[in-house]
Amino acid sequence: MRIYVPLDAAAKALGSDEVAEAITQEAKTRGIDVTVVRNGSRGMVWLEPLVEVATDLGRMAFGPMDVGDVPALFGDLAAHPKALGLTEELPWMKRQTRLTFARVGVIDPLSLAEYELHHGLKGLRNALAMEPAAIVKEVTDSGLRGRGGAGFPTGIKWKTVHDAQAPQKYIVCNADEGDSATFADRMLMEGDPFTLIEGMAIAGLAVGATQGYVYTRSEYPDAVSQMQKAIEIARAAGVLGASVLGSGRSFDMEVRVGAGAYVCGEETSLLNSLEGKRGIVRAKPPLPALQGFMGRPTVVNNVISLASVPVIMDRGATFYKNFGMGRSLGTMALQLAGNVKYGGLFETAFGLTLGEIVDDIGGGTASGRPVKAVQVGGPLGAWFPRGLFDTPFTYEDFAAKDGLIGHAGLTIADDTVDMLQMARFAMEFCAIESCGKCTPCRIGSIRGVETLDRVLNGDPSALPILTDLCNTMKLGSLCALGGFTPYPVMSAVTHFPDDFQRAKAAAE
């Protein structure tokens, strides 16, 4: 008997460790031979802990489980009060296009043998048979763009590093996932770390880098542990090291843990932190692709960007770019959070409308009240009202509506949320997290909080000042922290003017 219990941090917070232990003890009491596999999460967080039992028909899902539900797993499974049916037949799973997350929740995350049985290392083996320039071209042709926020074409970044002449080059994975409503990086590192390792190794082969670093945050102890264990296993198996899979070509990597500063999610601030310096933003140029880590050419890519590379190298650029629309190609790992009925991770091709994502996939609000707004792209993302729910989920369509996709985290809010308070929170967040290097961000965010406090106290005449301030921050900040903070502020002003006028009425 084989039973799967998630080791994902969200599942553990909801009691999956206790459920796993209860299954082991119950099996021992009954004298039944049971293998408990600690897998990654399937992404249905509202059903965690989600336990799966392997049957002749496939894996049956049960959830949300607690310790008291365990004994019934050893009886008639179909009659179990928490039985949900076959996992792959659940509506949440059937509607997805899982490419990057195809193995998450399916395999034992630290079993290299299981990883290979599910298309693992095929992309790396294909890459080893190609010239570096051909690997770069394949990634370029796929249309893959940065999944961390900027949406910059991955192939162009790789080509810049490939063409640079230097005695040492580096691959740096930005796993400093600090945005609200984002957890895809963590879920992948915990549930399928070999995919990230394979993607980084391919990147190294493509650009001539022999050393890689995964920079993640101290708030992710489980992800750090999983990545470190997986790297050791990969190194012992010859996937990493002086001769990758016996090819004679070298690539190795390690995990570095940051202290949790939000601004270290910005690539140059991250590189400073990685070098042991204060995490402050560098002026550009020079670009990290030319002078990055230790002044050497460096590829800095997000976890999901790098984890998307193995499937591209396995199945080809043409296969990958058949998903999506326009210049937004491939799939995106949507993360639904906030006041949402069905929160979790949902991987799908670009192109669904925001309304389909919030209403059909997310099921609306958990409170049952009407959806008022959705913030897309973390704390620096714009707030979208229901009137814009027909917007297709692509980089271009969101940019046309003065928004951004960012890391594809969606925070849903119902009609009780005051958007003036949300605008103030955005400015306050920027003030707290600013590295302090540039004046528009350091001073602008403080003045922004003060200006919004005037509005809160019934002075709408401060709104033109707020608009000018946001324009200054947007155009003058060194990085996206100050440059993108105007998105949530101005979208709240534009789409929810009643919330700003209400403060004046209350003051009077």
Give the positions of each predicted feature.
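Conserved phosphate/anionic-ligand binding catalytic regions in large, soluble enzymes, centered on
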Residues: 11-12, 46, 120, 139-161, ...
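Ferredoxin-type iron-sulfur electron-transfer modules in oxidoreductases and energy-metabolism complexes
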Residues: 14-37, 55-77, 122-141, 167-178, ...
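Short amphipathic, charge-patterned alpha-helical segments
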Residues: 27, 199-201, 349-366
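Intrinsic disorder at enzyme termini
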Residues: 78-108, 286, 293-305, 313, ...
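Gly-rich Lys/Arg/Thr-decorated short loops/hinges at beta-loop-alpha junctions or inter-strand turns
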Residues: 107, 112-122, 173-185, 288-293, ...
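Accessory "access/gating" subregions that flank catalytic or transport cores
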Residues: 125-165, 321-322, 327, 335, ...
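Histidine-anchored nucleotide/phosphate-binding helix
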Residues: 192-206
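Hydrophobic alpha-helical positions that pack around
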Residues: 224-350, 362
